[in-house]
Amino acid sequence: MSLSFLLLLFLSHLILSAWAQGEKRLAPKGQPGPAATERNPGGASSRRSSSSTATSSSSPASSSSAASRGGPGSSLEQSSFQWSPSGRRTGSLYCRVGIGFHLQIYPDGKVNGSHEANMLSILEIFAVSQGIVGIRGVFSNKFLAMSKKGKLHASAKFTDDCKFRERFQENSYNTYASAIHRTEKTGREWYVALNKRGKAKRGCSPRVKPQHVSTHFLPRFKQLEQPELSFTVTVPEKKKPPNPVKPKVPLSAPRRSPNTVKYRLKFRFG
């Protein structure tokens, strides 16, 4: 009886070990076996909680990064637009009043005209909006402005007083009127003008009119040299006819000049 009992125990042990090995082979690599799940029943829940906390922590970071990315764009949109670099024109404004003057802007804020062009008369006209321009002195780095009293002066900062309305006249000249200041009762515009001596006129003066020569300015800008439009045509060369061959004339032997004999006449008398 003891031997048979031992044999039964040995066979049952072999069967149990074989069954355990078969379950291990059938189970996938990522999932633990039944023994592991029984030993650590809270493993899956802990992993789920850790993954949820990771996603929750990543969400505010992503939102903060998105906010930081959107920040510069919003600040650029809110920044004020001064003028377009593509609309700049550099040159001088020539007024044909009197002997003719070039509008010039001084660093100390003075504005007048000079008969001969110089560094102070180099101006930069840029577009602010449709029909509205600003005038800046390149050398003085100040903007042309008109005060409430109609006086022309130079301003270090670009303000509403520096905005002028540019109009093209029929005689190819331009007029520049203040975009803000004008006569309240009649609505007459105040224009940039020079007198016969080259001094700046007040825009509020009743004599300053768009029909007067003192308000007419001719823009003289540097134009880029346009490339010469040229093309080449290939003409087939005409073959020249061959030169006619001259017949060869046989050279004759040089003739010998005959010997000349001189005779002296002798006269005998008696």
Curated annotation (Swiss-Prot):
One protein family per Pfam: FGF
Compositional bias annotation for Polar residues: 76-86
InterPro entries to which the protein is assigned, alphabetical: Fibroblast_GF_fam, IL1/FGF
Signal peptide extent: 1-20
Main function: Plays an important role in the regulation of cell proliferation and cell differentiation. Required for normal regulation of the hair growth cycle. Functions as an inhibitor of hair elongation by promoting progression from anagen, the growth phase of the hair follicle, into catagen the apoptosis-induced regression phase.
One GO biological process term: neurogenesis
Protein name per UniProt: Fibroblast growth factor 5
Complexes and interactors: Interacts with FGFR1 and FGFR2. Affinity between fibroblast growth factors (FGFs) and their receptors is increased by heparan sulfate glycosaminoglycans that function as coreceptors.
Similarity remark: Belongs to the heparin-binding growth factors family.
GO cellular-component term (any): extracellular space
Compositionally biased tracts (Low complexity): 41-69
Sugar-modified residues: N112
Species lineage: Eukaryota, Metazoa, Chordata, Craniata, Vertebrata
Family matches, as Gene3D superfamilies: 2.80.10.50
Compartment annotation: Secreted
GO molecular function: fibroblast growth factor receptor binding; growth factor activity
Keyword terms: Glycoprotein, Growth factor, Mitogen, Secreted, Signal
